[in-house]
Structure formats: C-alpha cells, structure tokens
Amino acid sequence: MFLPTTKEEMDEWGWEELDIIIVTGDAYIDHYLFGASVVGRYLVEHGYRVGIIAQPDWKNLDDIKRLGKPNYFFAVTAGNLDSMLAHYTPQKRLRDFDSMSNEGIRKRPDRATIVYTNLIKRAFKGVPIALGGIEASLRRFSHYDYWDNKVRKSVLIDSKADILMYGMGEKSILAITKALESGENIKDLEINGTVVRVNERKIGDIKERYETKELPSHEEVVNSKEKYAEMHRKLMTMDKVIYQKVGNQYLVQFPPIYLTEKEMDEIYEMPFERRAHPSYSYVPGIVPVQFSVVTHRGCFGGCSFCSILHHQGKVIQNRSERSILKEIRKLLNHEDFKGVIQDIGAPTANMYRMGCKKGLADRCPKNCLYPEPCENLIINHKPLIKLYRKIRDIVGDDVRVYVRSGVRYDLIMYDEEYGEDYIKELSKYHVSGRLKVAPEHISKKVCKAIQKPDGRLFKKFLEKYREIAEKVGGIKEVLPYWLIAHPNCSIKEMIELAEFIHKNNCYSRQVQVFTPTPMTLSTTMYHTGINPITNEKVYVPYTYREKKIQKAICLYREEENWEKALEGFKMVGYKGVIYRWIMEQMEKKKKQKKDKNKKNRLN
C-alpha cells in the first residue's frame, strides 16, 4: 500500500489528518532508493501518519494544500538529485528529460528546495519546515554554485526553513518528530544529523556545552578564495559541532548519525511496493533499479568530485547477511519480477564489511585509499564472495544476479588474499555485458587531484582481470568511465589519456564532463584554483571550447570529433599516435569517397 498522496488515499489508511507531509521534487516511487519513500515509511513504522506531495505545481497554492496542514511539520526535498544538476548539462544547457518524472517530462523547478519552502510558507503561515535530501545536504554551508558562478549562502538561510537534515535522514527526522510531538519548539532543537540557525547569544551557549569547530564566515569565503579553501579543509572531518557566521546569525551543524546493523535491516525490510505510484503511466527512473538490492551505505573512497563523503559519509554501515537474503527471497515473489536482480551493491559495490579497524573514519581527515591504502583499513572481499554464493544458491540458475554499482578496482588489487577470487566470482556470474569500472583518468597529475590511482595500477588491473576472466570463462570485457575537464586536466593530459586508451584497448563512450557540484573537493579546486589539501595551485579548464576539445580527444574514434580533436592537437603541437590514427582514418574516408564517386561516374 502506497503512502497517501490525496485525501481519498488518506481515507484508505483511515486517517483524517497527517502528522508530517513530505514534499519531493521526484515522482513518488515507493522504493528504498528514493529518499521521500524511505523517511516516509520509517515514520509510519514508528507510528506517525505521513503523506507525500510529489512534484507540486509551484505556480499556485492548490497542489501544496491538497493534504491539508500537518500536525507537526512539512519535510522538503528536491529529490534524488540536486535540481540544478537534474535540469542542466555541464555546458549549462537545459535538459529536455527528467528520469525521475512521469514520462520523463520535467516537473520540478530550479532550486526546488527554496521554491517548495516558499510555497509552503505562502500556503500555511507559521508551519515548521525541515529540509532534507541531497540538494539541502550539500548546500548546508556557504558553497560555490556553478550555475550562478558565485558563492551562495546555506540553503537553510536562503529558504528561511527552520531546520536542515543532512545525510540519509531517517533517525534525525524521527528525532525531530518526537521532539515536536512532546511540545518542543523546532527552533530550539539540537539533534545530530541536523543544521540549525541561531543568534549570537545561542552560539555562545553551544560553544560552552560542545566541542566546536568554526568555519570562516560566509563573508570571508565570498571575498577570499584562500578562506574558501580553508573552509573545505575544516569540513573534511565531522565529529565536532561545526558553526559558521552568516551576517548576524550562525549556522550550527551537529555531528552525523550512523546506523547500526539492526537499524539498517529495519529500514531496508520495510514494506516498499518497489514501483511508481499508480497515478503515473511510466517513470523511467524506476526501471534500472526496481530490483536492485542495497548491501551497505557509505564510501571511504574519497574521490574528489564525489558528494558521498559529505552525504553518506566514510563510515560503512552494513546490512546483515540475513536481511539481504531475506530481501532476495521476497524479490523472487514480486509480481513484476522477470528473472533479473539488477544490482547487488551500494555507492561502491565492493566495500561490504570493509572499513577502518579503529573506527576513526569520520574523525580522520586522511584519504583511506589514496595515495596508498591506510594501514588501519580492512580490505577483505571474503564476506562479499560468501554473500554472492548464498544469493546464487537461493535464486538458482534461472535468475541472473548482476553487480552494476561501481566497483573499486584498486580495492581488488590491494586485497592480496581474496582479490583474485573476487574477480573470478564477478566475471563468471555477476557481470552484464562488460565490467563497469571508473578509473576516471590515468595521468599522475590529474589522478592526484582526483585522489585516485594513476594508469599504472589500472593497467595491471586490466591485465589481471582479463587473464582471470578468460581462465574461468567469465566476461572479460571492461567498460571504463572517464572524467574530462577536471581541475589539473589540460589538453596535454587528455592526449595522455587517449594514448593510454589506444595502447590498452579500453576505448569507451562513457565520458563525463566534470560538473562542479556543491561541497566537493573538486568544486573547491574549480572555484579557487587551489587544492586545499596540498595548498598547490591547480590548472582549471574553464572554457566550453576547451571542454569540447577534451571530450573530442577522449572520443577520438568518432568521426564527428576528428576536426575538434585536431584543433586541440594543433594548440599544443601534438603529432603523436592519436594524431596519426585520425589522419589515417581521414585519408581512408577520403579515398572511399573518391572511389565511390568514380564508380558512380562509370555507371
């Protein structure tokens, strides 16, 4: 049974009023990979009445009023993606498709968190509003906004909401609900996993009672790129209460909340429908994930461009094997199931049961994997291999079980005891088409900025994976994902990547142009020209022209990219192997055209 989205559906639940109303920028998909569904179900499991308003019309008040006024508060999320990222390409062109909307038709506003909050304030004066989701989470402090090309204030201040939940949000939203139920004022709450606004007097009180860390003020980070870089450095650990001055008020972030294994199991075993609400004809976003299974949360990879660090965190939070296998059995009986489990994974598929042996991940500013794996890091694929085998025993030979989440190839290479066994399992039983990995780049200079191993380790992985996969009769093709126009990547580094691709036979059309998103290390480098970890200056490819050239060089095998790639080669005086390959292909095309014209004349 879906959570209610109309008064009629409230009647089906036997509810005359609601305690919490969730407003989301996504279509309502009742699946644990969609935040509104997870927190909604979690609150219902704890005895509260919850409704969902998905993608309300923001041009009038009728839609936002359809469920009435909640007893406690509205919870607002832009959806599974930052609304600006969902709407615009890296070249800031408007996208014409939104996979999280019915029929792919765009139905959310730009800066959805702010727009929805203002809509609620117009409709219901004085009702408390809590923000959540990835957009709010990563915009909780002052942040560089790529689309405005400026440093913006926290979305909590810009929206004038009452409280912001960062991270995954289940326990913090439950704590907020219980506090309001007991009569507390939302403006007085001090709950882990949240950010609040306070005045000068209150910040003094907080500093007396907590161990705190102060960020440079909003005014400082707007006017100084060095201060902005300092702010990022200070945000690399989250164990203390963190505060930032903004004008005459302060933002205060309380430490993150992590889930126990029991709590993880409770959340993922809730009775999700695993489909879009029946009011929709077709929501594309559910298709590739409908029968995916999450094994854990968090990622200690520390990629510079990734938002997971500041959202889910570095601490791996595992589900029990029992809970995962229980879900597998349940999937087999779902009426929509057609014999394929699309993914067994998480932000990084092969981090299940791994992590810091000292439990210090959230307090340690160091990268767990780069430049070398930390001595305190547990790297062991045995629990995952065991899990895969148990899943196959349950589903039998007629059901395909894939691993489509990202796999960290460096973790496999660092696991001397079970790395090769993991390759055997993966290639033989769990790869669909080609193994998807994300080296991102191979240049030492670029990989240092990205905080990933360079091409030397990836080359060794390619050789090892292909060799083992061939021996066991597995799928030996590898599909790399490449990232272009990242800070420290110039045309010379793109040529270096293209030559590596050519030499190692790992061409891929999976190429992404770097887009600066709030709160990431890469975005700090893009905005400041400084690597805040090393304090070194970095090269930043700002212009659309250079980004197009870099993309053309990476996709050098496509005929439509040859002229643009040659333009880039001319800029740096390059006449190496990729230049010669393109010239040979152009000559062949020219000869083919000439022969064809000659044949036509003879006819």
Curated annotation (Swiss-Prot):
Signal sequence bounds: none
Record-linked Pfam families: DUF3362, Radical_SAM_N
HAMAP family noted in UniProt: UPF0313
The protein's name in its UniProt record: UPF0313 protein MJ1155
Species of origin: Methanocaldococcus jannaschii (strain ATCC 43067 / DSM 2661 / JAL-1 / JCM 10045 / NBRC 100440) (Methanococcus jannaschii)
Domain Radical SAM core: residue ranges: 285-557
Keywords: 4Fe-4S, Iron, Iron-sulfur, Metal-binding, S-adenosyl-L-methionine
Residues reported to bind [4Fe-4S] cluster: C299, C303, C306
InterPro entries: Elp3/MiaA/NifB-like_rSAM, Methylthiotransferase_CS, rSAM, rSAM_horseshoe, UPF0313, UPF0313_C, UPF0313_N
This protein's record includes keyword 4Fe-4S: yes
The family this protein is said to belong to: Belongs to the UPF0313 family.
Classification via NCBIfam families: SAM_YgiQ (TIGR03904)
Co-factor binding comment: Binds 1 [4Fe-4S] cluster. The cluster is coordinated with 3 cysteines and an exchangeable S-adenosyl-L-methionine.
